[in-house]
Swiss-Prot record:
Alphabetical UniProt keywords: Lyase
Encoding gene (name): nhhB
UniProt EC number: 4.2.1.84
UniProt xrefs under SUPFAM superfamilies: Electron transport accessory proteins (SSF50090)
Domain of life: Bacteria
Molecular function in Gene Ontology: nitrile hydratase activity; transition metal ion binding
Chemical reaction(s) catalysed: an aliphatic primary amide = an aliphatic nitrile + H2O
Protein name: High-molecular weight cobalt-containing nitrile hydratase subunit beta
């Protein structure tokens, strides 16, 4: 899906605001949102690609309005939709809780059970522990050093292929095994592992004469996006 979320190579957004000694969370609810997402991850609820698709499909105006408030607003909206779509909660339950909060009636923040400190440490360790994401899948069609061309496409669903590399020629510089294919995962069709590569593009291939001849941009791209150059 092409939309306002895919801003690679675009200009006119102004300076990136910088806050010295910025806190991890500006509001308490942001930390609680991250806790919800961590819980979903530990429970095996597939949400990375689904959440991206839900955020992308909310419409450009809503996307901008939410992100002006807090980036975590995006994450919370997506988490709610995934929990409903996966039938973990009902839409009626979601609406009821939102209404309670809006009316100031939701005040019970005590956990329903006592937390095990060891479980918390395990969750933190799992988040930071390096590990391979490769899964069993098809043999790769390309090798290191191969010249490839990114397909010209205009997908209606979720994709991890940015607009600025489409129809451009690059070189395979790394292979990462077969990994979860975002197009399938975001649509609830399972992991569907496909070969994943890092492709290097010269800045001039991407930006023409405006590109610096010494610069290279590397992008991770799945095999279905690519054809031989």
């Amino acid at each position: 899906m092409d939309g306002i979320h895919d801003t690679g190579g675009m200009t006119g957004y102004g300076p990136v605001p910088y806050q010295k000694d910025e806190p991890f969370f500006h509001y308490e609810w942001e930390g609680r949102t991250l806790s919800i997402l961590t819980w979903m991850h530990l429970k095996g609820i597939s949400w990375w690609d689904k959440s991206r698709f839900f955020r992308e499909s909310m419409g450009n105006e809503n996307y901008v309005n939410e992100i002006r408030n807090s980036y975590y607003t995006h994450w919370l909206s997506a988490a709610e939709r995934i929990l409903v779509a996966d039938k973990i909660i009902t839409e009626e339950e979601r609406k009821h809780r939102v209404q309670e909060i809006l009316e100031g009636r939701y005040t019970d923040r005590k956990p329903s059970r006592k937390f095990d400190p060891a479980q918390i440490e395990k969750a933190i360790e799992r988040l930071h522990e390096p590990h391979s994401l490769a899964l069993p899948g098809a043999e790769p069609s390309f090798s290191l050093g191969d010249k490839i061309k990114v397909k010209s496409m205009n997908p209606l669903g979720h994709t991890r292929c940015p607009k600025y590399v489409r129809n451009k020629i690059g070189e395979i510089v790394a292979y990462h095994g077969c990994q979860i294919y975002p197009e399938s995962s975001s649509a609830g069709l399972g992991d569907d592992p496909r070969p994943l590569y890092t492709v290097a593009f010269s800045a001039q291939e991407l930006w023409g004469d405006d590109g610096n001849g010494k610069d290279v941009v590397c992008v991770d791209l799945w095999e279905p996006y690519l054809i031989s150059a």
